[in-house]
Structures are given as structure tokens and as C-alpha cells.
């Protein structure tokens, strides 16, 4: 059964490693050392729920509801554009230290709400967990399926806590104005690139629904 566990672990790691809104948010909270472990836990728990839903049958709901998929996609586009704009606005702020200080003053609940939006409004999360993991894990028998799910869940917990702790450890070097400017430019550009890719998919969903 450990074979299925490591298959899930490897696949989960491959899907979670690329820079996306979730990773960018966890990294930034780690750099600020602001509720970073709590955010890592909430991200991992969110992944746990999505992974279990995808592998144990929830994928059928998304695949059989094209309108739901279209709504999720365009909601994700809007959120990623907003998130990318915020990062680029901070990067090109004339007083970067003041902009960073304003971000640091965000309350716990605002940070939690942003984290939930970053996770649950990201269509790629549903495609990864419901489509990819759902199609692969759904073919397994009950016991192997549990080990496969445990492997992918382990990848999420290891990655998010590792990323948060590493970012907090490197915080003294990454909190400089130059480093913050570079990080925010990269994050903003990546968010807008993902939004553009999702918009193309969203247009395809709309055209398919109208045909």
C-alpha cells in the first residue's frame, strides 16, 4: 500500500510546487512572520477537503456542471487580476516601506478571508483535485484509494509548512525594499499570467455552453 502512498505524495508535490496564488500568499505571510503557521495549516486543511472531495466522488459534480465550471473560472480570473494588481501596486509604490507597513497592519480575519479566497476562488485547485486526482484516484479500490489520498494530503501539509517556515527563516533577507519589490513584481506578473490563461479557458467554456 505504500506504493500508492508515494504515488500520491509525488503527484501532490508535482501539482503544488509551481508558484501560484496560494504559494505566493503563504510565502508573503512567512516573510512578514504574520500568522504564517496558521495560514499554512488552513491551506493544508483546505487542500485536504478538496483532495478528499475529488478522489472520493466530488469530481463528477464539477465535470457534469459546465455552468458551475464557467462561474468558478471567471471568478478566479477576477480574483487573480485583483490580487496581481495589489502586488504590482505595492511593488511600484514610491514609498515601498509605507505600503509594506500598511499590509503588515492587516487583521487576522482579513488575512484568513484572503487566504480562503486565494484557495477556493482558484479554478486550478478544482482542476487539480477534482479532475486530475479524481480521475486517477477514482479508479482505485477502496484501500489503495485511501493511501493515495493520504499521500497527496501529506504533500500539501509538508509543502505549506515547509514554505512558511523557510520564508520566515529567510525573512531578514527578503524584507529589504529591493527584495520586496522583486517578489511583488514576480507575484503580480505570475497572477496576471495565470488570469490570462484562465480567461482563455473561460472563453472556451462560454462558447461551449452557447453552442
Swiss-Prot record:
Membrane recorded as keyword: yes
Substrates-to-products reaction catalysed: L-arginine(in) = L-arginine(out)
Top-rank taxon, per record: Bacteria
Cross-referenced InterPro entries: Arg_export_ArgO_enterobac (IPR023445), LeuE-type (IPR001123), Lys/arg_exporter (IPR004777)
Membrane topology recorded in Swiss-Prot or TrEMBL: Multi-pass membrane protein
Gene Ontology molecular function: any one: L-arginine transmembrane transporter activity
Major location category of this protein: membrane
Keyword annotations: Amino-acid transport, Cell inner membrane, Cell membrane, Membrane, Transmembrane, Transmembrane helix, Transport
Subcellular location: Cell inner membrane
GO CC terms of this entry: plasma membrane
Residue spans crossing the bilayer: 1-21, 37-57, 68-88, 111-131, 147-167, 182-202
Function, as annotated: Involved in the export of arginine. Important to control the intracellular level of arginine and the correct balance between arginine and lysine.
Family to which this protein belongs: Belongs to the LysE/ArgO transporter (TC 2.A.75) family.
Record HAMAP family: ArgO (MF_01901)
Protein name as annotated: Arginine exporter protein ArgO
Species: Klebsiella pneumoniae (strain 342)
Encoding gene (name): argO
Amino acid at each position: 500500500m505504500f506504493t500508492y502512498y508515494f504515488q500520491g505524495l509525488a503527484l501532490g508535490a508535482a501539482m503544488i510546487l509551481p508558484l501560484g496564488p496560494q504559494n505566493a500568499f503563504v510565502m508573503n505571510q512567512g516573510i512578514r512572520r504574520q500568522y504564517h503557521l496558521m495560514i499554512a495549516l488552513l491551506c493544508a486543511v483546505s487542500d485536504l477537503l478538496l483532495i478528499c472531495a475529488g478522489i472520493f466522488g466530488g469530481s463528477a459534480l464539477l465535470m457534469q456542471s459546465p455552468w458551475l465550471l464557467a462561474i468558478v473560472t471567471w471568478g478566479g480570473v477576477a480574483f487573480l487580476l485583483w490580487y496581481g494588481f495589489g502586488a504590482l501596486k505595492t511593488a511600484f509604490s514610491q514609498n515601498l516601506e509605507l505600503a509594506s507597513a500598511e499590509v503588515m497592519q492587516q487583521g487576522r480575519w482579513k488575512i484568513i478571508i484572503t487566504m480562503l479566497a486565494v484557495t477556493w476562488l482558484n479554478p486550478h485547485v478544482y482542476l487539480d483535485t477534482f479532475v486530475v486526482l479524481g480521475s486517477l484516484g477514482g479508479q482505485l479500490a477502496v484501500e489503495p484509494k485511501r493511501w493515495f489520498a493520504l499521500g497527496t494530503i501529506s504533500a500539501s501539509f509538508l509543502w505549506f509548512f515547509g514554505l512558511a517556515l523557510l520564508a520566515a527563516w529567510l525573512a531578514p533577507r527578503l524584507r529589504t525594499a529591493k527584495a520586496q519589490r522583486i517578489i511583488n513584481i514576480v507575484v503580480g506578473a505570475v497572477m496576471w499570467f495565470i488570469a490570462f490563461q484562465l480567461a482563455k479557458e473561460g472563453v472556451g467554456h462560454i462558447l461551449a455552453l452557447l453552442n
